[in-house]
Each structure stands twice: as structure tokens, then as C-alpha cells.
Design a protein with these regions (language model features):
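N-proximal low-complexity "stem/linker" segments adjacent to membrane-targeting elements
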Residues: 1-31
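Short, acidic, metal-binding catalytic loop of nucleotide-sugar glycosyltransferases
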Residues: 30-40
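Active-site-adjacent helix/loop segment of glycosyltransferases
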Residues: 204-254
Length: 257
């Protein structure tokens, strides 16, 4: 673990999941550290990389709390570890594959002064990104491309999100196996908490995966989400969904016509 500054009570905890981000981690953490100013902010990186990312963080960012995680952890599980170790009144979540805009922390703190329990932001792609980078972006993040109007939301990507701690504490039972944002957001809405999607908080996606790595990640994330969701559904209903699953491509096609 890195040597870190002593912060009695952080106002904001920035929790970053980190997987094989040696090409972007320095720019990501460098930008966040520039924005700390006089605010009491802690930065926690939970990393399970095999490409030297941990060594870069330990060498160049001594004021960052580096938590080393096992190689089999998914990004939402890394977030969960970091959130459990955080102490801020507010918690911002992203990954080391994203470079925050220069006003990222200021806008997060501003939006957290409102009544929203959670706030999601815009995600842009690096203009110099390659074919795979753009494919990943359009598959996963195009919904959050600028411009768009601010709106009350049901869900948003945790790759650019922030929350009030007391809001997360109210749904902490959903985070026993990691911070899977869809599940967390559904629980927050059931508790009558408000969520906001805003264009004022922006991050930029950099090359995050190889094509093979992204396909593997999507498969295992989908499997984990499906397993978690199915565990709360009666066996008879699961069987019915399984029998009807061949209709999914046709239903999706009709929706998008």
C-alpha cells in the first residue's frame, strides 16, 4: 500500500477501479491530483493489473491509497472494495481508463449539494482513439455522449458517478458482492431516492480494452448480473424466461424500428 497523506475526515472520496491501465493511469491520477486544491479529498485506487499499472501508481503517486486486489475480481468488485475503505461524505466512482475534465471534482461537489443521492455524468471518447476504442465506446457509453440535457434518471454508468454516503448506506445490502450500479440504482429508486444525469460532469474514455478482453469482460459481467438477478426469481419464472429467450433479438429489433 502506498504512503498516503493523513486526512482526518475527507469531504470526497474518489474511488477508482484499475485494470491494466498502464497507458492512461498517469494522466488520470495526475488530473485528479491537480484538482484537489484545498479540499479534503482522498483518492483510492483498487488495482488488479498485470501490466505494471501498480508499479506506476506506487512510484509516481505516493499520496494515493493503492489497494492491491486479486486478479479474478471484476471492476464492480474493485469499486466495492474501494467504497468499503473510503471515508468521505461523498463518493465519486470511475476507473483509471478515464481522464476527468479539468472541473470534474468542482462539478461533483457542486451537484452533491443538491437533493440527489446519486449523480451520473457525460462520457466522451478520446478523439485519438483507435477502432477498438470507438467500438467499446459506442457499445457501452454512447448513451452518455455530449450534448444532452440534464434529467432525472433511473440509471447511469458508474464509470462517471458520485453518491452521498448516507444514500449508499441505505442500500448497502446490494453491495455485498461489489458495486454493480444497476442493482444499486434500482434499490435507491425503491427507497424513493432521486438520481440525476448531468452533462456538467465529464470524463474521457481512453483505450481500455483489447477486442478480446472487452468481449470476455462483457460475457462475464453479463453472467454475473444474470446470476444475481435470477437468484431472486422463482424457478418457474426463470424457466419461462429461458423458454422465451429466443424471442429477444426480434423484440429488440421491433423496439428500435
Amino acid at each position: 500500500m502506498s504512503k498516503i497523506e493523513t486526512i482526518t475526515k475527507p469531504k470526497l472520496s474518489v474511488v477508482l477501479a484499475s485494470q491494466n491501465a498502464c497507458r492512461s493511469v498517469s494522466e488520470c491520477l495526475g488530473e485528479i491530483e491537480k484538482q484537489r486544491n484545498e479540499d479534503a479529498i482522498e483518492i483510492i485506487v483498487v488495482d488488479n493489473s498485470i501490466d505494471g499499472t501498480q508499479e506506476i501508481i506506487a512510484r509516481n503517486f505516493p499520496n494515493v491509497k493503492l489497494v492491491r486486489a486479486s486478479k479474478d475480481k471484476f471492476i464492480p468488485e474493485l469499486w466495492g472494495i474501494g467504497i468499503n475503505q473510503s471515508a468521505g461524505d461523498y463518493i465519486a466512482v470511475t476507473t483509471t481508463h478515464f481522464i476527468p475534465a479539468k472541473n470534474w471534482i468542482a462539478e461533483i461537489l457542486k451537484k452533491q449539494e443538491a437533493e440527489y443521492a446519486g449523480v451520473g455524468g457525460a462520457i466522451e471518447n478520446d478523439a485519438q482513439g483507435g477502432l477498438v476504442s470507438w467500438a467499446v465506446y459506442f457499445c457501452r457509453y454512447s448513451r452518455y455522449m455530449l450534448p444532452f440535457a440534464d434529467e432525472d434518471a433511473e440509471d447511469f454508468a458508474a464509470d462517471n458517478a458520485s453518491y452521498k454516503r448516507d444514500g449508499l448506506d441505505r442500500v448497502k445490502q446490494t453491495m455485498e458482492n461489489g458495486f454493480w450500479e444497476v442493482t444499486v440504482h434500482q434499490a435507491m429508486k425503491k427507497e424513493k431516492m432521486s438520481l440525476l444525469l448531468t452533462s456538467d460532469i465529464v470524463v474521457y474514455h481512453h483505450d481500455s480494452f483489447t477486442f478480446r478482453g472487452f468481449m470476455r469482460q462483457r460475457f462475464w459481467h453479463g453472467r454475473q448480473f444474470g446470476s444475481t438477478r435470477a437468484s431472486s426469481i422463482p424457478t418457474s419464472k426463470r424457466a419461462m424466461f429461458g423458454l422465451l429467450s429466443p424471442l429477444i433479438p426480434f423484440i429488440l429489433s421491433l423496439i428500435h424500428i
